[in-house]
Design a protein with these regions (language model features):
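Hydrophobic/aromatic beta-strand patches that form the interior of the parallel beta-sheet core
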Residues: 1, 33, 76-78, 103
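Short beta-strand/loop motif that positions the catalytic acidic residue
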Residues: 71, 77-80
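Acidic catalytic loop of the alpha/beta-hydrolase fold
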Residues: 82-86
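A structural signal for the main folded, soluble domain(s) of proteins
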Residues: 5-8, 16-17, 29, 63-72, ...
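Mobile cap/lid helix-loop segments that gate and shape the active-site cleft of serine hydrolases
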Residues: 37-67
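C-terminal catalytic histidine-bearing segment of alpha/beta-hydrolase fold enzymes
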Residues: 88, 92-95, 99-132
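Glycine-rich, phosphate-binding/catalytic loops in enzymes
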Residues: 18-20, 49-52, 93-97
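Primarily recognizes the serine-hydrolase "nucleophile elbow" in alpha/beta-hydrolase
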Residues: 1-48
Length: 132
């Protein structure tokens, strides 16, 4: 099982892209939850943040999970109902491109959505820890 939030959501998505992990490692993945992930880095090229990131179009595409085929692992994207529109869009486009589930968590935003991981009875934990 893998879960990651925001940039960590990007990292767990990249691990799910074909060719990123050795087969003996990827075969052990049973469930992945990107939480408010960055899935398409291309829009960052046109922001002030790119002066630090130095993304080219080529590198943004190369590092964007939505531009790659995912491994066949049970995946569900989680995002807060009160996220900024850009994060909602990132979650929606990842779910659409990867044809995986999308949970929009009621009354949650970017910083408190991970509180779901503190409650073993939350929908997120139930999903993560259900028997495969």
């Amino acid at each position: 099982m893998l879960a990651g939030h925001s940039a960590g959501g990007h990292l767990v998505c990249r691990m799910l892209c074909e060719g990123m992990l050795p087969k003996h490692v990827s075969d052990r993945l049973k469930r992945v939850v990107p939480i408010s992930p960055l899935a398409d880095l291309q829009p960052l090229i046109f922001t002030d943040l790119n002066s630090d990131l130095n993304l080219s179009l080529e590198s943004a595409i190369s590092e964007s999970p939505v531009c790659h085929k995912p491994l066949a692992v049970n995946t569900r994207v989680w995002v807060g109902e009160h996220e900024r529109p850009a994060f909602l869009h990132q979650a929606e486009i990842l779910s659409e491109k990867w044809q995986c589930g999308l949970n929009i968590q009621p009354d949650a935003h970017h910083f408190d959505i991970i509180d779901q991981l503190l409650n073993p009875k939350s929908d997120m934990c139930k999903y993560l820890f259900q028997k495969v």
